[in-house]
Amino acid sequence: MIYLDNAATTLRKPPQVIDAVVAAMGSFGNSARGTHEEALAASRVIYDTRCKLAALFGCKRPDHVAFTCNSTEALNIAIHGCIHAGEHVISTDLEHNSVLRPLYRLERENNVKLSFVPADRQGNIDYADFERLLRPDTRAVVCTHASNLTGNTLDLACIGAFAHEHDLLFIVDASQSAGVLPIDMEQMHIDVLCFTGHKSLMGPQGTGGLCVREGVDINPWKVGGTGVQTYLHEQPEQMPTRLEAGTLNGHGIAGLNAALDFLQETGVETIHAHEMALLRRFVAGVKKIPGVALYGDFDHERTAVAALNIGDMDSGEVSDILSEDYGIATRPGAHCVPRLHEALGTEEQGAVRFSFGWYNTEEEADAAIAALREIAT
């Protein structure tokens, strides 16, 4: 099988990631739930992983890295915990439902007002629209770093400067960029960075988290056992305990720790360069196929994602043919980004997404081009 669905999850992990998960399953106790060696072993690895994530993302305090099951949970914690009834939020048309649905819920239940920076037919935005949409009651900007459909990226430094100038919270969804694009919370004025571990970070599924700038108070979305301050009726105030009720996924975090070592040794820039070389090769070949429509802006910084359609064929049909006849795994449909499909004019047809990863090869990119050529003729 040729796996080109890395934007959904990286199927091939560094071998040390798998080894670390297996080792942890045989040796870890429950972090912060005892002083015996097995519990302490889990605690040490979890803290070490916080430190590595803080260094990767430019978060000043490792204890402000809180673990979750994925970026969806992290975004729910950030959005529900930071935005209050009646406030106004600016977002964009590029957003995943992990951002949109929490915002829509607040709109329905808490009278939160929403404005969206529109996307054009290439999936780009006009950054001047942030100023245009600003209101006296604006509380936050919530946006993605990279589109999971087109691969287009947003200029976080530009948006962060706008948010900082107007004293707004800046919450970022880094699901598609963490581990493949440089992120610096301080330089980009990011208040809360939400990430998942199983995509470009190449860690296990069931891992993710949020990095919180010092001074940003998030009301806990869930509360419960913490292993400390048992007699408090409320969730403890200190981070990361405030946002980590219940047992952490220590086994998964051990795998994420090993993945972060691999990223450090290999280099985020090296990984991104490899993936982009494959994308450029793929796009150049696809552009020569009559009847294929590509979506997105391929002239600016982006991730290694290409979305396309063949004539008026349903995207699901194309993806099924690729899988069943050619052994190529892709992602069809709406990709949980309804507003962006509306902007691109693909809400009925959807799109077939090809997403390249570290373990893909030129031969696999060429095979995908050849398959599309046959399907299109």
Residue ranges and their predicted role:
Residues 1-377:
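Pyridoxal 5′-phosphate
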